[in-house]
Amino acid sequence: MLPAAALPWTLFFLGAAASLQVDIVPSQGEISVGESKFFLCQVAGEAKYKDISWFSPNGEKLTPNQQRISVVRNDDFSSTLTIYNANIDDAGIYKCVVSSVEEGDSEATVNVKIFQKLMFKNAPTPQEFKEGDDAVIVCDVVSSLPPTIIWKHKGRDVMLKKDVRFIVLSNNYLQIRGIKKTDEGTYRCEGRILARGEINFKDIQVIVNVPPSVRARQSTMNATANLSQSVTLACDADGFPEPTMTWTKDGEPIEQEDNEEKYSFNYDGSELIIKKVDKSDEAEYICIAENKAGEQDATIHLKVFAKPKITYVENKTAMELEDQITLTCEASGDPIPSITWKTSTRNISNEEKTLDGRIVVRSHARVSSLTLKEIQYTDAGEYVCTASNTIGQDSQAMYLEVQYAPKLQGPVAVYTWEGNQVNITCEVFAYPSAVISWFRDGQLLPSSNYSNIKIYNTPSASYLEVTPDSENDFGNYNCTAVNRIGQESSEFILVQADTPSSPSIDRVEPYSSTARVEFDEPEATGGVPILKYKAEWRALGEGEWHSRLYDAKEANVEGTITISGLKPETTYSVRLSAVNGKGVGEISLPSDFKTQPVREPSAPKLEGQMGEDGNSIKVNVIKQDDGGSPIRHYLIKYKAKHSSEWKPEIRLPSGIDHVMLKSLDWNAEYEVYVIAENQQGKSKPAHYAFRTSAQPTVIPASTSPTSGLGTAAIVGILIVIFVLLLVAVDVTCYFLNKCGLLMCIAVNLCGKSGPGAKGKDMEEGKAAFSKDESKEPIVEVRTEEERTPNHDGGKHTEPNETTPLTEPEHTADTAATVEDMLPSVTTGTTNSDTITETFATAQNSPTSETTTLTSSIAPPATAIPDSNAMSPGQATPAKAGASPVSPPPPSSTPKVAPLVDLSDTPSSAPATNNLSSSVLSNQGAVLSPSTVANMAETSKAAAGNKSAAPTPANLTSPPAPSEPKQEVSSTKSPEKEAAQPSTVKSPTETAKNPSNPKSEAASGGTTNPSQNEDFKMDEGTFKTPDIDLAKDVFAALGTTTPASVASGQARELASSTADSSVPAAPAKTEKTPVEDKSEVQATEIRHLQQK
């Protein structure tokens, strides 16, 4: 017990100690092996502490800054203990002690438990096993508490399969007895600790290796040596992993690297290719397949055969009638070849003997001999030795020469006649070659006494050419041949030929218009061939014989001839004679027959010729007897034999002798029936059958009528087409747009004005003619009926290629465009309203000025006929698509319009011809200057007083007849306008070819004259310039073309008729004042002059 005095102090310190509070957060901890964790020691209170210390489970104080177990003083009131990468030995009670000067020591503890998580210590993947072995899948699991192990395969517990082959061993390994390839896959080793609810698993790949199995595709292979061929030895192997293949020959490994020229392998080594097989390659070859599970091999025996080859032959020479000679032939090959002999005329088998025993053949092993006894000259020639076995054969020729004396052959008797050249042939057989001579009566030929004889020699014959002049040339001729073995002579007789005897007529088969004569050949030909047969016939009672010659070759084939051109129901006599080179022979006895009455024709004769394509045929129809009536046609029917339907019947005119049947079925039999028909009826059908060719897989090039073009030819053609296209485009640009290469050449080399020079030409007064063209002008007058937007009050439209240029200041419904294209003045009257237009001067003359021509139209006072005037019936028909329009009534008020003369060049020839009113309204008319002046004067008067009556003309044209009114479209396409070029005619031509004014008025549209077009003038022919003058003038003025004729005005004109006349011509010196121009016209001219 404590003393009483110490008790108060003890209570004091206990009270102080009790006042200190030390806590460790967390208060307890569990750490798995390998993990890290920290603990915080905290002190509650405001006193200052001297120290905060940590002690390990074994009582040792933990020092700061250790590597694995670290202690760190955070501040005056806390400290941290950190355990890194914990292990089992770190488990225990850790103590935190707090020391204070004022209050003493206080402490707190924490129990640190360290456990081992589930770990797979030994569970390799993959694990491989051999098929059929007992496999044990290893899986070692490490844990603080004993785990429960479960094996799964394909997501299921293997023990639930109830397969006795699967067993979990005591060490938790999985055993599979007699493992199969189907057992291969992924197995999961899964460990569980129930106390902690911990689970972990490891997937193990199980591979089952299968030992290789190998088999040879052919256990025995045959090959042929010395053919530069290759042989392939092949083995097929299975197994897992894929086995590797190696080869041996008679136990020795084959390496491709050692002899690449002899051996090669495919990509997996399963095929061995032996190149250029020879006899040394015959051996036993083994293919070996090997993998992880084992190896296996297969054997292939290669047997090499040799094609026969002739190794020895020898040419021989013998004398005729010599005792014997032997020909020898040796050959090699495997199997041993058999040897046969043959000549050019026969085959000689082994052990064969001729009937007379002259030829003997003996064979032994690889040698054969041919023995000839009592040699004859016919034994000479080529002997072929052939060695053959199951692999092939080989042949070699040897030659036997037999020397013998000459032997002569040839026809002994030769026929000819005086003057006919003939050859006497002396064929000579001799070895060595013989010298041939001809003799006549012991005299060597040729000689001076026989100038009509020539000799021609060849190596095998001699020909004596004789042209008999008289009886003396006929007789015996001797041929003699000599060589070093001997000589031979032969006599030949030249006999004078005679005409043939008569043929005999056996039977005559008459028809309506023909007769078929059967005959026998003459008994004697006269020594020379019969060339023709002459048939003669006449009707009973006629004195003259009709005759015809028939070729002997054709007549002798069937022994018949056919006489044609006979009359029905008429009795005839016929006789025959043969013709040879000597002449016509004896005539046979006549044979009488009577032709049949008119009837249906005989069936024609058919011949076929297959086409090159194989499925077409040309059937020739050969006419036979027509039955006394001309054949009208042939009826042709055909079909394939396997088909029940006939093709459509073909009617062939009698003048055509064949028909082509095309697009027939391939490899099919066809039958054709042809019937001839005349007025009396139809003949019996003629039948012809044929078969088409089999359908070719590839059509041969020869069937094509033309050979294919090569690549170079095709490229060349394309280049030519491209160049031609460029030329065409350039020419088009030249004529239409005045541009392109041709235009550049014309401008730079020929001095032609370019497109940019048009305005300049206008300013210089060059208008519409080039340097070398005529100075005679042409004025083209055209009637326009299309109303432009400007005249209709619509929006102004810019001119383009498809819209005409218009003149906005005129309000007239009908106007005519006047273009002065050359300095000559041309104009005329029209039954339309007043024609008006303003042009600038187009002359280079320094005195040229702007002139206004005014034309007015009024009814004539009197109609004065003119001899040159055209009647209405002579009017040219209206253009296609144009509607006739009636001229205006005579009471119409004349309208005045100024015309501009583009030339001040005078002309002395006044107009003499009266022009039809359609000329001016339809096309340009040629007028004299007097007429133009008269029109100008009238225009002037009209400008002063518009109501003044016009001056009547001296000459009038008869009124145009009225024509029915037709609706006309006021819109034209550029194509239609281009298709209707205006034409300028001379007065003479206009009088000859007047145009219909109403149809022209209805046609409407502005038509430009064709460029470079030839025009007939009174003084000759000239070409218009290749530029559009109207377009250039209005381009310079900055205005559009005159207004077109409105459709309404055209209909108004169509409802009335009127006469038109040419105003009286003023004096030649009379001028038209320019001051009478309207204000708008004056403004346009000033504008043009300023430019």
Swiss-Prot record:
One of its GO terms (cellular component) is plasma membrane. Residues 20-711 are extracellular. Its main location: membrane. Glycans are attached at N222, N315, N347, N423, N449, N478. Disulfide bonds join C41-C96, C139-C189, C235-C287, C329-C385, C426-C479. Residues 845-856 have a biased composition (Low complexity). Residues 1-19 form the signal peptide. One of its GO terms (biological process) is synaptic membrane adhesion. PANTHER family: CTX-RELATED TYPE I TRANSMEMBRANE PROTEIN, NEURAL CELL ADHESION MOLECULE 1. This is Neural cell adhesion molecule 1. It comes from Gallus gallus (Chicken).
